[in-house]
Structure formats: structure tokens, C-alpha cells
Amino acid sequence: MAGRENDSPIAAAEPLVDLTAASTGAAAAEVPPELLAQSLGQYLRAWLQRIRSGDSGVLPVLLGIIVVAIAFQIANGKFLSPQNLVNLFEQSTIYMLLAMAEIFALLLGEIDLSVGLVMGLGAVLVAEMIQPGGLGLPWWVAIILTLLLCSFVGLVQGSMVARLKMPSFIVTLGGLLILEGVCIIVLGGSLVGIGNSHYNNEVVIYDLFYGKFSPLVSWILLAVVVVGGAGWVWFRDSQRRRSGLVAPPASLTLLKILVATAAGVIVVAVCNVNRAHFGTIVGLPYLIPIVLVVMVGWTMLLQRTRFGRYVYAIGGNPEAARRAGISLPKIRTWGFVLASLTAGIAGVLFASWQVSITTNVIKDANQYVLLAVAAAVIGGTSLFGGRGKTLHGVLGGLVIGSIYNGLFLLGVPAEWIDVVVALVLLAAGTIDVLSRRGAQPRA
């Protein structure tokens, strides 16, 4: 039976544990030593030891964001202003979502070159569906249908990769070209606008990107998230300790809660500063909870479910995963479906951001394909499969957004900005290769 692919989604727990422990580069390969620590001091020592061994996690990208922010603030005193910081996050949202979409493919050791045009398709579909002179669908129906159709694109591409054994590069490159043509055909050379003053459905879509909570609601949302999140994390870790399972020290759990709370307070405080030169613009953008929900949802899926363990196992060692009874075609197909679904979410926000959708906007979506891969890799996701988190996509998207934003403030031409982003990508790719090489056991 080991020589035959098993389509059953059910596999024994023990073989999967052995599999992931043996898979080189799999994110869930071993229990990190710091998780076995009994105190905060032991945790920090084990964490530093892991960094010295070459497994630095998100530390490089966090340090990179800090360095970039300081450098641009010194070069241009406006970079860290509340107005620019909120603008920076809004500009980075598309990069973040597309990077999270790409991560599903990269974790499986594949690549999806179509996510940018799936985003374009999502933008065209949702804009066309809500037009009063067209289908005139309610905004929520338009969004659901858009996400379903985008997911169908992933289903087709994933099936071709998983069932027909076609290279994902070829399949998704073909998908990119087909989707570009489909978007242009659907638009028919016309402009599709999304206003914010007359038609209710258009206003809702418009507000997804440009809408903001009031300052009071922003603080209430933060309080709900902090109390709910902190309570869940504390309860989860406490339950694991009482059950004799691996869990971080209570002091570390408390420290994480305090750090997350402080970060949330800073974000809401910055957003509640008046950012308008004339009039008033305050409040938390709707975009922040949208990205947060997507990131947390996909993190839970990848880190806390059997499906997520299977994804990491396949990316780390496909043959061992197959022998453990994992259905490779099914998991790979679902990986591409989720990538396209996430790109569809980005497409809805892209339509809101652009306000009007034209063929030129769709052609511009091509550049987001490579930026999605760049954001995922810069954030810390491996190009070789089996290692990465959705958080890496958010951080990588923030890095790319910071570079574009900072260099734009300095008046650097667009072509040179692309050169800088490419150099950062090459550096991240080099680090990925070297870290993998260092992690391989010596003969």
C-alpha cells in the first residue's frame, strides 16, 4: 500500500508525527526547545540558542522593518507621522493579502503565478455585479459569488497540478494569461466605477477600503479583541499545562499578551489622530480588522488543524507524506483553492481601492504576481516548501509597502524603487537558501 497514493483524508496521528519530525525544513518538524522551557529565562536562553543555530524566525524581517522605518524617518521626517503610517498600511494591504495567498502554494513546494490576475478577476466581478445598470446584486451576494468564482479558478488549477501532475509554474502562468483576457473581455473596454454617494451597494464596497470606525468604536474593538484573545490564549496554555502537554511558561504567555496589547494600543492611538490637513479624518480603517481576521483564520487553519499539518508535511517531504497515508492530490488542490480564495478577497478590496476598474488597471495587476512572491519570501516563507506562516506574508507585505512608500516620499523614480525591492528579494532568497543549507545534516 505504501507504493500507491491514498486518497483518504484520514491518516493515523503517529505516522504523521514521525513524518513531520523527519521532514527536512518542515515548519512543524520538531518541538522547539524553548517550548520545553519551565521559566521565562530558560525560554530566552533556548530562543537565543536557536537564533545562533540559524533558525531566526521572524526576527530578521522585524529588524528590517525597524531599520527601514528609522532610515526613512531620518531621510524624510514625515515617514513616521500618523498620516503616513495609516496610509502605509492601506497601501500594503494588497501586498499582505496576496502574499498570504501565495504562501499556500509555497508551503506545498509549488508556486502560483496567477494570484495577481485572480485578484483582478475578483475586482472586475464584484464591480460588475453591483452595477445598477447591470446585475444590480446586493453587495453581500456579489462578494460571495466573487469569492466562489475565484475559488473555482484555484480548484481548476489545483486539479491540473495535483491530478494531471502538471508543473504549477506552467499551469498558473497559463491561468494568468487566460484571466487577463477574460477580465478585458468582461470589461469590454468600458470603465466600471464604484461611487460613494448614490447607490448603496457601491457605497458599501467603497467603504471596505476607505471606511473607518469612529475613535470610540476603535477602542471598543481593541478591548474586545484583547480580552477575547488574551482569555483564549491563557485558557489554552493553562489547559495544556494541567494536561501535562508542552506549553510555554505562564510568564511568557503573560508577556505575549502584554506585547500584543501594547501594539494594539499604539495602532489605535495612531489611527485616532486627526490625519486631515483640512477637516477631520480619524478612526481605525476597516482594512485593519479585515487583514487581521484573514491572518488569524489562516493561521488557525495551518497551525491548529490536521489539514495544516498535512500541508507542512507535503512541503517538507512529499514522498514521506504519501507513505504516511496523506492524500497529496486532495491537499494540493485545496491549497490552490485557498490561494485563489484569498486573492479573491484581495480583489474585492482592490476594486474598492481603485474606485474605477479599467483594462489598464487589470494589466497593472500583473505586477502584483511577483510582488506577492516577493512579500512571502521577504517575510520568511521558504521557496522550497514546508516552512512559513501567514504572519510572514503580512510582515513581508509591510516591508514592500514601506520601501515603496519611503522611496516615493524621497522622490525616487518608480523604476529605481523596483530595483530596490528586487535587491531585497534577492537578499531574502539568499538567506533562505543559506539557512536551508545550514540546517541540512552533515554526512
Functional labels for PLM-detected ranges:
Residues 2-64, 68, 191, 228-264, ...:
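Cytosolic-side transmembrane-helix boundaries in multi-pass membrane proteins
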Residues 307-332:
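Short cytoplasmic-facing helical segments at TM-TM junctions of multi-pass membrane proteins
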Residues 70-133, 159-169, 184, 320, ...:
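Single transmembrane alpha-helix segments in multi-pass membrane proteins
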Residues 77-87, 184, 188, 271-288, ...:
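Inter-helical junctions in multi-pass inner-membrane proteins, predominant
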Residues 134-177, 395-396, 400:
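Alpha-helical transmembrane segments within multi-pass membrane transporters and channels
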Residues 110, 336-347, 351-421:
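Transmembrane alpha-helical segments in multi-pass inner-membrane proteins
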